[in-house]
């Protein structure tokens, strides 16, 4: 569920305290009504509103926690994390620690708009780090492609999405986590990058 119409286009349009409270109450009521169904809330910085009310991982995790309901969690869309200027691996790690990471969308963009491009074609390094973060938090839920073909054959776009994601997860699987952890303690930044590059 993406609450993207909840937000503002201009200053003073909205009482933010009331808006958050109404959102919290509405989600809590829905979660209580069907406690057997998980409600996964997706955040986005903007579109269709200029500023969406729930626009980053922290706010969405806070809302999910504030409901007090185990069946309320967060959808992490890689492209939305980029657009919000988050580090997707950090967002995955944070949400994974809260046990509120329910669902993952994969796509890519240039951080300026939600272009829904084939994952890894723009931000390959970020994707490998993201895949490793999902592994480290033990994420075993759904990962779905949220890509838009634009001017390309939709079947080809889906094929390439799966090819790129297989490649990304294969590279992440090759990473020696103990070796990486030792290098991160110093940190040996360029030794780390050279090591990851050697696995590509």
Short names for language-model regions:
Residues 1-4, 38-42, 142-145:
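Short beta-strand segments at enzyme active-site cores
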Residues 22, 34-49:
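Hydrophobic, aromatic-enriched interface-forming segments
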Residues 25-29, 35-36, 54-76, 81-200:
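Histidine-acidic metal/acid-base catalytic patches
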Residues 5-9, 46, 108-115:
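Conserved radical SAM core fold
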Residues 16, 20-23, 158:
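Generic structural signal for well-ordered, non-membrane alpha-helical segments
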Residues 1-18:
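Structural motif corresponding to the early beta-alpha repeats
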Residues 9-14, 49-52, 118-121:
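Short, flexible/disordered intra-domain loops and linkers
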């Amino acid at each position: 569920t993406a609450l993207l119409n909840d937000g503002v286009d201009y200053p003073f349009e909205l009482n933010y305290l009331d808006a958050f409270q109404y959102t919290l109450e509405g989600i809590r009521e829905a979660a209580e009504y069907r406690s057997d169904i998980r409600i996964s809330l997706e955040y986005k910085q903007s579109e269709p509103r200029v500023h969406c009310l729930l626009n980053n991982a922290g706010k969405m995790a806070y809302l999910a926690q504030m409901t007090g309901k185990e069946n309320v969690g967060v959808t992490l869309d890689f492209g939305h994390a980029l657009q919000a200027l988050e580090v997707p691996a950090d967002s995955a790690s944070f949400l994974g620690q809260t046990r509120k990471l329910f669902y993952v969308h994969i796509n890519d963009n240039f951080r300026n708009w939600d272009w829904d491009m084939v994952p890894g074609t723009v931000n390959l390094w970020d994707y490998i780090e993201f895949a490793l973060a999902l592994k480290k938090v033990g994420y075993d839920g759904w990962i779905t492609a949220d890509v838009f073909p634009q001017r390309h054959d939709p079947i080809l776009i889906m094929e390439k999405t799966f090819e790129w994601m297989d490649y990304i997860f294969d590279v992440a699987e090759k990473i020696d986590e103990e070796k990486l952890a030792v290098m991160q303690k110093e940190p040996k930044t360029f030794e780390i990058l050279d090591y990851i590059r050697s696995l590509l």
